[in-house]
Each structure stands twice: as structure tokens, then as C-alpha cells.
């Protein structure tokens, strides 16, 4: 086990393309860190830099108190699990797991002990003589994890290991990976574009965008207090409703609050914090009139999509986040919902409201 520390890490490719733009964070001994962000944000590049598969243009990467910038991948005491499993098709499960240990000259009894212990932990003991083509996707992923476990590394690195699995298997494997990490207590860094995967796995969540870190913290803290509109719209499904406010709306909603009236431009509200109501909002709370566009019933809950209405006319938002212009999502329990075309009032208490600067880059705490 080991701490992993990144200090002002940068990556610039030929032609001046800067993929990683000065990243600093630390992963504590035994912590599970998840790097999450959209495609092209730099998360996989950063993981490959930790692994030694990408060179570092500037900065330092420290693993267990040792700067590893110029150390070969094989000598960094890390083990990596890939998206495509990277198994040798002509070898049995046993030999796939043992291959790296043999190359390091480890005695046969020690190899056998490690392989069988990893197989026991992963519940693949009955598969040791099979070839990869005889395994399901989930079994292949277990073998790939087993190959990492037998090395007994200081750090596990996971590069979108569940991307090739179907939805049901992804959920099962997600739970297995978390249980395994807690059991082994090995420092882990995990890359995914799936925010639900990130939220459920992470001790520490690193949200990336455009080669920079937007926010670092506990997953629930990030969900409850996103630092920017990017984080607010990326973390959470459905995303946070983001509404561009006109100056008169800001004055009406936040009368007397100097920061809101001088800095705010975007109001955020989580879909589950909006209530369909026939009564006015509590003092300081939010009230919106919506025209229902669509209904999604997904079983235990229902999503109501509505267009904002102001003085009876639809409002087109200038900064809608990831939602269509002017659209608001309301998450309601159960299956009852208003009909499409119906006008409804939704309210939210003041403490559930989020405020951001007009450019969306800063959270404003009132």
C-alpha cells in the first residue's frame, strides 16, 4: 500500500496541445480514488502517466514517497486492469494469472499459492484450466483483476474496466470491485466516464474537464455542493436544472442579498428537490410555473419534463447546462404524474437552491 501524490502534473503533446494542465491531488494509503469526466477530459491520459505509459512534461508523480517520473512501469510497483481485459487467448486462466510472476523469476510454489489465493478471493477457482474464449465477459474481467492481485502491488490502476459489460453485469462487477478493494485495502485509482459508477465506488472523487480538475472531494459533498455548473450538470442523473436568471428575477428571488445581486447569474436545483405544489413557496423559496412536455415512468419514480413559463409564455434559458433550452426536470416518487400539456407549479425551499456566477465557473454560497 502507498500514498499517490501528483504535483503540478502537465502533459503537452507535439504541436503544443496541452492535455493535462497542472494537476495537484493526493490519494491516501488504502483510498479508492475515481477520476471521472467526459471523453477527452484527460482522465485516461493522467492514469497512464501514473502507470508510466505516458511521459510527464512537467511536475512530479510520487508513489509511496518515491518520485517515479523516470522509473519504468514495471518498476513502479503498480498493477493495471484494462477495459479490454488484455488476456492471452492461447493460455489457460491459471497461466494468464501466473505469466507476470514467472517473468519476474518467482519460485513456482509462491506463484501457485498467489494464483490460487486470488482465484479463491474472486471465486474463479473452477475456471483455472479454461481458456478466455470459454469465459463470459464478467469472468474475463475477474481473471484480469486476478492477474493484478497476484502481483500484490502498492497501487491498483483501473482504466474503464467495466465499459464492455452489459448494464446488469456492470452493476454486479461494480459491487465486486468495491468489496475487493476494501478487503485488500490497496490504494486504487479508477477511471470512468460513468458518473453513477464514480459516485458509488469512490472514497475520493476527482471531476475532470478539459485537462483540469474541476472539483475534488467526497462524492456526496460534490453532489450536494458542486463547485461549478459543469460539475452540477455532470454529477447526477438526471442532471441539475440550471436556469439563467434575468436581473429582475435575481432581485425578486434574493432581495437584500448583495452577493446574489452582484455576482449570481445561474440558479441550480436538483430534480428531486422540486415539489409539485398548489401552494406558494415558503419565504425565500423558489416557485416556477411549468408547462409539462413529457413524462418518463421508470418504475419506482417518474421524471416530469416541463418548459418554464413566465407570465403565461415559455422562457428560453440562455445558459441551460445540459438540458434543452428552458427545460426543467422534476423527479417525483411513484408513478402518478400530471399529463402532458398541463400547467403545474413547482416549488423548492431556499436551502435547496444553488447559485453560480454568470459564467458558471464559481459557486456562490449565501
Swiss-Prot record:
Molecular function in Gene Ontology: ABC-type glycerol-3-phosphate transporter activity; ATP binding; ATP hydrolysis activity
Keyword flag Nucleotide-binding: yes
Gene Ontology CC annotation, any one: ATP-binding cassette (ABC) transporter complex, substrate-binding subunit-containing
Record's keyword terms, sorted: ATP-binding, Cell inner membrane, Cell membrane, Membrane, Nucleotide-binding, Sugar transport, Translocase, Transport
PROSITE patterns: ABC_TRANSPORTER_1, ABC_TRANSPORTER_2, UGPC
Gene3D superfamilies membership: 2.40.50.100, Nucleic acid-binding proteins, P-loop containing nucleotide triphosphate hydrolases
Domain ABC transporter: 4-235
Biological-process GO terms, alphabetical: carbohydrate transport; glycerophosphodiester transmembrane transport
Any Pfam family the entry gives: ABC_tran
Subcellular localization: Cell inner membrane
SUPFAM superfamilies in the cross-refs: MOP-like (SSF50331), P-loop containing nucleoside triphosphate hydrolases (SSF52540)
Chief location of this protein within or outside the cell: membrane
Catalytic activity: sn-glycerol 3-phosphate(out) + ATP + H2O = sn-glycerol 3-phosphate(in) + ADP + phosphate + H(+)
EC annotation from Swiss-Prot or TrEMBL: 7.6.2.10
Residues engaged in binding ATP: 37-44
Class of enzymatic activity (EC top level): translocase
UniProt subunit comment: The complex is composed of two ATP-binding proteins (UgpC), two transmembrane proteins (UgpA and UgpE) and a solute-binding protein (UgpB).
UniProt record similarity statement: Belongs to the ABC transporter superfamily. sn-glycerol-3-phosphate importer (TC 3.A.1.1.3) family.
Function, as annotated: Part of the ABC transporter complex UgpBAEC involved in sn-glycerol-3-phosphate (G3P) import. Responsible for energy coupling to the transport system.
Protein name as it appears in the record: sn-glycerol-3-phosphate import ATP-binding protein UgpC
Amino acid at each position: 500500500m502507498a500514498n499517490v501524490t501528483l504535483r503540478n502534473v502537465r502533459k503537452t503533446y507535439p504541436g503544443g496541445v496541452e492535455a493535462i494542465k497542472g494537476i495537484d491531488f493526493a490519494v491516501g494509503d488504502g483510498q479508492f480514488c475515481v477520476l471521472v469526466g467526459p471523453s477527452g477530459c484527460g482522465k485516461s491520459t493522467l492514469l497512464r502517466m501514473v502507470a508510466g505509459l505516458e511521459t510527464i512534461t512537467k511536475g512530479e508523480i510520487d508513489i509511496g514517497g518515491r518520485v517515479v517520473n523516470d522509473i519504468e512501469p514495471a518498476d513502479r510497483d503498480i498493477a493495471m486492469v484494462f477495459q479490454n481485459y488484455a488476456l492471452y487467448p492461447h493460455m489457460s486462466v491459471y497461466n494468464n494469472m501466473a505469466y507476470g510472476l514467472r517473468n519476474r523469476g518467482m519460485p513456482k510454489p509462491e506463484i501457485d499459492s498467489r494464483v490460487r489465493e486470488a482465484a479463491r478471493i474472486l471465486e474463479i477457482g473452477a475456471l483455472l484450466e479454461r481458456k478466455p474464449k470459454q469465459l463470459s465477459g464478467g469472468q474475463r474481467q475477474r481473471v484480469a483483476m486476478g492477474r493484478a492481485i497476484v502481483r500484490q502491488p502498492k497501487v491498483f490502476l483501473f482504466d474503464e474496466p467495466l465499459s464492455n459489460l452489459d448494464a446488469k453485469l456492470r452493476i454486479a462487477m461494480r459491487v465486486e470491485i468495491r468489496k475487493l478493494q476494501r478487503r485488500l485495502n490497496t490504494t486504487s485509482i479508477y477511471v470512468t466516464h460513468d458518473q453513477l459508477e464514480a459516485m458509488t465506488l469512490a472514497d475520493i472523487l476527482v471531476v475532470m474537464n478539459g485537462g483540469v480538475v474541476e472539483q475534488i472531494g467526497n462524492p456526496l459533498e460534490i453532489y450536494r455542493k458542486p463547485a461549478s455548473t459543469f460539475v452540477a450538470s455532470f454529477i447526477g442523473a438526471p442532471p441539475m436544472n440550471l436556469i439563467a436568471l434575468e436581473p429582475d428575477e435575481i432581485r425578486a428571488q434574493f432581495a437584500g442579498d448583495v452577493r446574489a445581486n452582484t455576482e449570481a447569474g445561474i440558479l441550480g436545483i436538483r430534480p428531486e428537490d422540486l415539489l409539485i405544489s398548489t401552494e406558494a413557496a415558503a419565504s425565500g423559496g423558489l416557485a416556477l410555473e411549468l408547462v409539462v412536455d413529457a413524462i418518463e415512468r421508470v418504475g419506482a419514480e417518474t421524471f416530469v419534463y416541463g418548459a418554464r413559463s413566465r407570465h403565461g409564455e415559455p422562457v428560453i434559458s440562455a445558459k441551460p447546462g445540459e438540458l434543452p433550452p428552458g427545460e426543467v426536470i422534476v423527479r417525483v416518487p411513484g408513478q402518478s404524474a400530471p399529463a402532458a400539456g398541463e400547467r403545474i407549479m413547482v416549488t423548492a425551499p431556499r436551502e435547496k437552491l444553488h447559485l453560480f456566477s454568470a459564467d458558471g465557473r464559481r459557486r456562490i454560497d449565501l
